Amino acid sequence: VLDGKVRDGNVRDGKARDGKVRDGKARDGKVRDGNVRDGEGGTPMTDTAVRIVGNTLRLPGGAAVRFVRTLRLPETGTHALPPGLGEFPVRRVADYPDTAPAEWRARGGVMLPVYLREAMWLSFAGSARPTALQVGVGKVCAVSGKPWSDRLSQRPQNYLVLPRQPWLDGINSGNGTVRQFVSVPLGLGATVEGQVTGEEVWGGVQLQSFPLSEEALAEHHRQERLRRGRLGRQRMRGSRSAGGFGAAPPMMSAAPAAPAASAAPAPGAAPSPRMGLGVGGSMRQEVYEDDRPLRDWSETPAGRVFVHLVTPPEWRRVTGEAPPPSPVDRAAYTRAGLPWYDYYDEDARDLAPTDALEAVKPVGDWLGEDLEPWQQPSPEQVIPLKDPPGKPVEDGDW
């Protein structure tokens, strides 16, 4: 939604039901892409290349990840899924050798701008094949609460299964809920990293992908051919196609962009240029249990990327670009009658919560009460739902 109207009522982040991307182009119509290299001054990666196409990170093995702006939820109660309000711009750290801090260059990866206390979610629309994706927040697993690891685990599970998992809005809190990702500066102790580990060293977001083994991938392709054959016969009989494991579910539309106001930082204390993720309100979203045996996945990651979260002033200083406008007013969004969403997969099992993540407190305990107006959406507003490669992104030492 770019003009305040819902295009088809079944899109959350620009991926429409017909498979066409409504908002997949960069703001100027050009695809900004690039390879990420392995450390400062390193050589380009080949098989392990993470690439940027538009604002989408494409990891080896088929995972696609976009960072989506959204409405911040109140820290009390459990809410429907908030909408997408457009993508965060993503840039390679290696493209700014003269302005990016040495610490960023050493870690490699990409950067994106966030306001203090801004909410985000991760979209996996466009993920091409089954992939186990690890998501870290300050090198703490957002699924298990365990320290970052280069190996997959199922006790507890420390990864998401794509494309079955269509998106991730926050850390796993079990019982069909997650707690929203909210940006905070390092140094307060408010990040998930600070609360779980007792220190704030890394910040940012970490992504790591594991493809299926060759044998499991061959079996997956065989099952997909059988599934497509069944769907084709169903369509010929006029029946409705089922969701299935092999394709991501339909997403929701981007909400109206915030007005083009001056890109001033959000109210509150001036944040550090280094940002991490804390948690905000709770929402109805499941983190799905993997129904494959662990042996189906590769033992080593195919690729990884460090995502630096930076303040708007630091973004402007490093890139020379204006950051996106301040986030849209959430009460005004709801008053306008625009949609919120519910998503439930009856064929999947939700992961149980972990002690480490259950103990994480909301950022309001550090930043103060959330005074932004809130208006509960009406039941009618809650909608139930069921490219060529670019240059590689540089990896580094983290």
Language-model regions, residue ranges each:
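Intrinsically disordered, low-complexity segments enriched in small/polar residues
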Residues: P44-W398
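Long, intrinsically disordered low-complexity tandem-repeat segments
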Residues: V1-E40
